[in-house]
Each structure stands twice: as C-alpha cells, then as structure tokens.
C-alpha cells in the first residue's frame, strides 16, 4: 500500500438521508480517516425518487459518496438478491479501486456484495453493528417480545418468518409495489387511532387467510436459505470487528471463526459538554436515539409516569419521515404530561449541548444491543446512564459506578432506579 489507503465504506444509509447510530459512526470514522486516506462511501436510499435505479456521485461534509438510488421498499433479507445493487456496487469498485472495503450493514444491500468485494482483490472488513448475520430480525428479539438466546447456527425458530423468503426468485410486479404483509401488520399495530388500527389489523388478517400465513411456512427451508447466504459472508470477509465482547461471543458460537473476529470498542469523536447555566430543582432524564419499538421508549414513558412532577424527561429522536415511527410516537405519547418534552430530530454535532442539559441518560432497550453509541457519548459528556442489565448495555455500564442497571423490560424496576436518583441527587 502507498502513502495513503483507498477505502470504500459500505452502509445501508448515510447522512443527510439518515443519521442513526451506525450511520453516525460510519460518518465519524470516514471523516477521521479522510484526513490521511482516500475515503469514499457507498450507500443506498430506498426513498422513492422520480428516477430510481441510478448511481449518483454526491458530497456530504467533504466526503465523496456514491449514492445508490433504488426507490424500492425493502424488508431486510427478504429482498436478496438485488441485481441492480450488485451492478451499481461493481461500478463503485471499478471507479474507486479500493484497497479496503469496509462493510457496516447489509440491510437493503443484498447478500452478495461481500463476495463481490472480495473478488475485486480488496481486503474486506465487516463491523458488526447488530446480530443481522445470525438473526433475520437483526436483534435476537422474537416477534412475541422475548429475547432469543441463540448460540447455535442451526437453531432457527420461526419467530420472524415474514422477513425471510424461501427462494431467491424475483417478486411479481404487484408485489414489488405493495409493502409486504409484515410491514402492513407493523403499520396497523402502531396506528394511534383505535378504530383505524382495528380495521387495518382485520384487513391484514383476511389477506393472510387468503394468501397463507407466513408463520406456517417451512422453518427448515428458511433456515437453509438464510444460513447459506450468511455463511458465504463469514467465509469471504477477511476480518470482523465486534464492538462488544457479548456480540463477539454470539457470532463465534454461530459459526464465525474466532481468529477472524476481533473485539474492539467503537472509536468516538471527542467533544466538550456544554454545561447549562444554574442548577435546576427537577432532575432531567434524557432519551437520545431512534423511535423504534425495540428501543424501549414506551417502557421508559411507563416508568416515568410514576415520578409525578419531580423530574423532566427529554426525548431526542426522529422518525426520519417514516410513517411507522411517527405513528408509534403518536400512540405511545397520547395523553403524556407536560413534563415529557419531545425535541424531535437532532444534529449529532450538538451532542455536547444536549448532554449538558441532562442529569441522567436512560437507555431502555428491549433487545441486547451491541455497544450503544449513546452510552459512550454520555460517558464522554460525564453523564451517568441507567440501562438494562443484559447484553452490550450491561457490558458498558458498571452498575453503581457510572450508572445503574434495571431488569430488562421491567418498567417498575426502571421507575425504582429513576426514583432513587430523584431522591438522592448527590449519588
């Protein structure tokens, strides 16, 4: 390699189109590397456009990006393979001639880009931001809300059946334009108006009766389809980076050779906390992150209702234009007291000021998490964290030292921990 390295970052979405955890990390890493190396970012947007199926060259904050505009609706791995994305990615490889291709996610990217990158002669690195290569639902979280303790690649429960297609054939034209029943079911469940929610759920039920319930399809066929694709990724990547030891152990138990996967904590962008002026009588709790059901915002609101007027809860997050997330927020926030303040989307460059306005950050996720950037940002800003006692969250937060643990999914226990801090502010 020469005095600089040609690096192609690959991720499902990227700012300014989306700025959630893995996208922010990819952006910060790319900015840092670009001070010395030739760094470009290949990403996808499934936002409907007038001219979909094209590869555009753009610039975001000085970073060169190759934006693959597909305009499709994706249900994760149900859409493998994607010939257009494969062709666009090959164009990016030919244009950039990278020495290193660094993957961050495969949602909406198809199953064969890792193999395509390897065939180009580049070294292939894959940072594991979630459990997507061993779980079709990405979170090791069943659709009934229970955690999955998967530690065997052959263990494949039918807990997320609608996300896995049992063959690699093309979808019919109508199916390409209509969201899957899985999406309609989620959309129905998160409708804020009860009458509309019941009507949509009934319609989805009729559609499942007529077209067959995906939950009754052959688990073995879906397991074989899923694991065939992911084993190829295990084989063709040169190195996997695991930001938590918990995640590393899960991947090793499910087939990644231990010598190919390294535990390394996320590198973080330094920033200064902007302290607020004057003390406040009420403790300020904060949630910073996406408004997705598995993030536990509903659990946090339930716990907070027991605090009365002794604290405030500030929620920083965005639905990013998603009707599902927007409806979810309207439903769970219906009738909330004024001590809950929803700030909406935030610019991560303001994280120092946001943390400066908070006394405690709460990470109430219902899944294991990996190595939440929010927790690490809170620690940089000197803010303690209350989080669940499982997975990567518990690994980061030392109970009673730099934060508190509560029993995952237990609103009463979370309320107890929040009350403890309200009543003992000097802790």
Model-predicted regions and their roles:
Residues 1-54, 61-64, 94-96, 120-123, ...:
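N-terminal subdomain of nucleotide-sugar transferases
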Residues 24, 292-306:
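A conserved mid-protein helix/loop that constitutes part of the nucleotide-sugar donor-binding site
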Residues 133, 153-273:
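Donor nucleotide-sugar binding/catalytic pocket of nucleotide-sugar-dependent glycosyltransferases
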Residues 312-329:
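Glycosyltransferase donor-sugar binding loop
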Residues 326-349:
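Nucleotide-activated donor-binding/catalytic signature segment of Leloir-type glycosyltransferases, i.e.
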Residues 352, 370, 375-380, 394-395, ...:
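Short alpha-helical segment that forms part of, or immediately flanks, the ligand-binding pocket
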Residues 363, 375, 384-387:
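Short hydrophobic beta-strand element within catalytic cores of glycosyltransferases
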Residues 399-400, 404-411, 420-426:
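Conserved acidic donor-binding segment of nucleotide-sugar-dependent glycosyltransferases
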């Amino acid at each position: 390699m020469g005095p600089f390295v040609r690096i192609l970052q690959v991720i499902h979405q990227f700012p300014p189109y989306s700025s959630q955890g893995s996208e922010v990390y990819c952006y910060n890493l790319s900015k840092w590397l670009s001070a010395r190396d030739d760094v470009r970012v290949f990403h996808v947007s499934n936002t409907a456009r007038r001219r979909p199926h094209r590869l555009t060259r753009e610039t975001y904050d000085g970073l060169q990006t190759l934006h693959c505009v597909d305009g499709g609706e994706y249900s994760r791995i149900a859409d493998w393979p994607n010939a257009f994305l494969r062709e666009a990615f090959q164009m990016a490889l030919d244009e950039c001639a990278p020495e290193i291709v660094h993957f961050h996610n495969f949602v909406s990217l198809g199953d064969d880009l890792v193999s395509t990158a390897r065939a180009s002669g580049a070294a292939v690195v894959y940072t594991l931001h979630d459990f997507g290569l061993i779980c079709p639902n990405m979170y090791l979280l069943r659709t009934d809300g229970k955690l999955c303790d998967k530690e065997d690649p052959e263990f494949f429960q039918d807990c997320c059946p609608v996300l896995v297609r049992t063959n690699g054939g093309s979808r019919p034209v109508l199916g390409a334009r209509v969201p899957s029943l899985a999406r309609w079911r989620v959309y129905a469940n998160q409708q804020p108006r009860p009458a509309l929610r019941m009507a949509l759920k009934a319609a989805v039920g009729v559609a499942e009766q007529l077209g067959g319930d995906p939950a009754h399809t052959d688990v073995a066929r879906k397991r074989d389809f899923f694991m065939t694709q992911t084993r190829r990724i295990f084989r063709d990547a040169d190195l996997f980076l695991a930001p938590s030891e918990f995640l590393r152990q899960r991947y090793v138990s499910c087939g990644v050779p231990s010598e190919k996967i390294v535990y390394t904590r996320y590198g973080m962008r330094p920033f200064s906390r902007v302290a607020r002026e004057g003390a406040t009588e009420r403790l300020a709790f904060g949630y910073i992150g996406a408004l997705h059901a598995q993030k536990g915002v509903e659990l946090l609101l339930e716990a907070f209702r027991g605090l009365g007027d002794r604290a405030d809860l500030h929620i920083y997050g965005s639905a990013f234009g998603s009707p599902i997330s927007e409806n979810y927020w309207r439903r769970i926030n219906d009738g909330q007291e004024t001590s809950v303040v929803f700030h909406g989307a935030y610019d991560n460059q303001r994280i120092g000021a946001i943390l400066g306005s908070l006394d405690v950050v709460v990470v109430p996720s219902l899944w294991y998490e990996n190595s939440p950037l929010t927790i690490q940002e809170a620690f940089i800003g000197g803010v303690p964290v209350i989080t669940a006692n499982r997975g990567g969250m518990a690994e980061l937060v030392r109970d009673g030292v730099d934060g508190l643990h509560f029993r995952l999914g237990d609103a009463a226990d979370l309320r107890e921990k929040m009350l403890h801090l309200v009543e003992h502010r000097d802790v």
